[in-house]
């Protein structure tokens, strides 16, 4: 494995499974030490253990990304433990699907709080350190649903679409200090949820994807590595779509 992130420290939210876990492990294979953040200590520690098994340092933290005070305290602990942070991956996300007329305000708020407010809080918590060291990489995991919308997911689509505007605005604010800010928009990815999809539903979905396949969490991890590594040094304010050609 190439060591393009040798001795850098990456914070990954939503690291307990799926895309977050894949990013944590790929970054570790590329030489990074990883801070694994998720809602539960069990999930965070499990992935941190996998990172350590790859020969890298790892720290596990459990926090609600939408709780500003808790995140600020966690960020302080992370900086104290790790000494510095070079990369922030805002990946934490949830869904609370439902048609507009049936969606509760609580379900709307829960999704916006985690998917959008969480990225804002974490980015703000580490931006001072990035500005001080005059370097840093921030990568926000959005979704193609934020580009095209989806019936029954107006809350999720709104949160993911807003991440694009957030990414571009922060890229303009932090760019002069050597900090890049980009977004990745995954398409349909093989997850626990898609594993239980009915065959006929899966077949219909594949018709919309020119590559005729769902992506894997590792596909998103490779895109994140590209943006976080030396190859991404002159890229900022952009959204990289990784969806098998579904959105063109």
Write out the residue ranges for each language-model feature:
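Conserved glycine-rich cofactor-binding loop
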Residues: 9, 16-18, 40
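Conserved glycine-rich Rossmann-like NAD(P)H-binding loop of the short-chain dehydrogenase/reductase
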Residues: 32-46
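Substrate-binding pocket helix/loop in short-chain dehydrogenase/reductase
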Residues: 99-100, 107-112, 205
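C-terminal substrate-recognition "lid" of short-chain dehydrogenase/reductases
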Residues: 120, 131, 135, 213-242, ...
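Active-site helix of classical SDR
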Residues: 123, 159, 167
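Alpha-helical segment proximal to the catalytic Tyr-Lys
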Residues: 128, 172-176, 233
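Residue(s) in the substrate-gating loop at a strand-loop-helix junction
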Residues: 143
């Amino acid at each position: 494995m190439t060591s393009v992130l040798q001795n850098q420290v990456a914070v990954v939210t939503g690291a307990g499974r799926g895309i977050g876990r894949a990013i944590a492990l790929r970054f570790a294979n590329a030489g990074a030490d990883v801070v694994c953040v998720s809602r539960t200590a069990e999930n965070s520690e499990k992935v941190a253990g996998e990172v350590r098994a790859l020969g890298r340092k790892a720290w596990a933290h459990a926090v609600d990304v939408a709780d500003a005070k808790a995140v600020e305290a966690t960020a302080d602990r992370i900086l104290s433990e790790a000494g510095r942070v070079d990369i922030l991956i805002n990946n934490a996300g949830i869904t609370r699907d439902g048609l507009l007329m049936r969606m509760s305000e609580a379900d709307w708020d829960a999704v916006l709080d985690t998917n959008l407010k969480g990225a804002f809080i974490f980015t703000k918590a580490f931006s001072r350190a990035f500005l001080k060291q005059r370097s840093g990489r921030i990568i926000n995991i959005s979704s193609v649903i934020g580009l095209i919308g989806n019936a029954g997911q107006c809350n999720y689509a709104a949160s993911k679409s807003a991440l694009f505007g957030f990414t571009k605005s922060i890229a303009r604010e932090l760019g002069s200090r050597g900090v890049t800010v980009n977004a990745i928009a995954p398409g349909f990815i093989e997850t626990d949820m898609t594993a239980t999809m009915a065959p006929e539903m899966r077949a219909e979905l594949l018709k919309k994807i020119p590559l005729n396949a769902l992506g894997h969490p590792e596909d998103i991890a490779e895109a994140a590595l590209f943006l976080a590594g030396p190859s991404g040094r002159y890229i900022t304010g952009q959204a990289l779509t990784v969806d098998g050609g579904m959105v063109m």
